[in-house]
Swiss-Prot record:
Name of the molecule in the record: Ribosomal protein uS12 methylthiotransferase RimO
PANTHER family: RIBOSOMAL PROTEIN S12 METHYLTHIOTRANSFERASE RIMO (PTHR43837), RIBOSOMAL PROTEIN US12 METHYLTHIOTRANSFERASE RIMO (PTHR43837:SF1)
Protein role: Catalyzes the methylthiolation of an aspartic acid residue of ribosomal protein uS12.
EC numbers on record: 2.8.4.4
Annotated cofactor note: Binds 2 [4Fe-4S] clusters. One cluster is coordinated with 3 cysteines and an exchangeable S-adenosyl-L-methionine.
Protein source organism: Burkholderia ambifaria (strain ATCC BAA-244 / DSM 16087 / CCUG 44356 / LMG 19182 / AMMD)
UniProt catalytic activity: L-aspartate(89)-[ribosomal protein uS12]-hydrogen + (sulfur carrier)-SH + AH2 + 2 S-adenosyl-L-methionine = 3-methylsulfanyl-L-aspartate(89)-[ribosomal protein uS12]-hydrogen + (sulfur carrier)-H + 5'-deoxyadenosine + L-methionine + A + S-adenosyl-L-homocysteine + 2 H(+)
The MTTase N-terminal domain, residue ranges: 5-120
Lineage top rank: taxon: Bacteria
SUPFAM superfamilies from the UniProt entry: Radical SAM enzymes
Protein localization: Cytoplasm
GO molecular function, one term: 4 iron, 4 sulfur cluster binding
Amino acid sequence: MSQSPKVGFVSLGCPKALVDSEQIITQLRAEGYEISGTYDGADLVVVNTCGFIDEAVQESLDAIGEALTENGKVIVTGCLGAKSSASGSNLIEEVHPKVLAVTGPHAVGEVMQAVHSHLPKPHDPFVDLVPAAGIKLTPRHYAYLKISEGCNHRCTFCIIPSMRGDLVSRPVAEVMLEAENLFKSGVKELLVISQDTSAYGVDVKYRTGFWNGKPIKTRMTDLVAALGELAAQYGAWVRLHYVYPYPSVDEVIPLMADGPFKGHVLPYLDVPFQHAHPEVLKRMKRPANAEKVLERVQKWREICPDLTIRSTFIAGFPGETEEQFETLLDFIREAELDRVGCFAYSPVEGASANELDGALPDDVREERRARFMEVAEEVSAQRIQRKVGKTLKVLIDEVSAEGGIGRTAADAPEIDGVVYVEPATKASKRYKVGDFVSVKITGADGHDLWGEV
């Protein structure tokens, strides 16, 4: 029997790009290709790129160059594949003319066509043995579930719509089938992602789909309720990411707080507010009523006291005054957000914000980012200290002789804090990766927790 052709894979960028990689790898495996963990063991290499900020562009170009040097046969996909150079030609083809093919993001079909052209697929009578949940690059106990592609917003600092297009929602039955297959495969935590989770279904006017004979609207609240019901059957978690602050978010909070989905639809919201001063928000083309946002945050916490809010912000946006920046700091103190990230504004090629007046020097942007993080970390440390002495449910990610590392409902993988768990002293309390365990929290710093089973 001839040996199956082997494809190497390099995946860069955000969780949405990771899901694209998973879909491509799943299709490769379904068609009988093997996935190689090394360049020299592969017949060709696929590189999934990121093109959002300058550092990501350079990282992607470097990865392509390395793959060309080490292997020589490279197909490129992802956001950078849609990016043009200053001359108007494709940036990747201009920098690396020896690549075999270039596609944009969310292009499984195009990638597979390119693979077929340069590495014909094998005949394999056992291709149906690929698991229904697909091939995942995450650990077995958690997975990302992408519910839509693209974005209808035109934030001035962002070029995602130009690379990924307008919003296209996946059919609700398709989403639910993938979720069920993931839970059946042993996934304990499902992380719902998209460019704009709140807008799910807008493009199809919230049309009604059917799952197991039941009608479900293609709408965030209805999908979350259905996922919560499914997660409850498997004793699993559902976590929401990239939730644009639409009014519809208010409808999801009660699902987290009480009823049959409590403990399954996690009391966790990843909401990118970006700023708090109305003038800056207008220049960003973001919702500009900071006072109402603060009221909503307070209302959310009244309904769901355990709610964890993660957000991201931009400091040093063009035209931002010191007074406007101080308004942002005041908002952080008042809103008491649990997890916060901040970027010093960085011009992105193709973004309309580049045309705005009032660009700030690099040192001012970076100084404001540092000041922001100092305040945000102080707020976060105060909130996390309140967990000391409590017993929390923890999902174990790693186990070693020194103990375990896990996460609470307040901690998404990779971006939030962790819980360092002491080794179990009794056989009945031993745990393994993917287990839920009750942990008594004994200590905390500004980011992480320590505890014992």
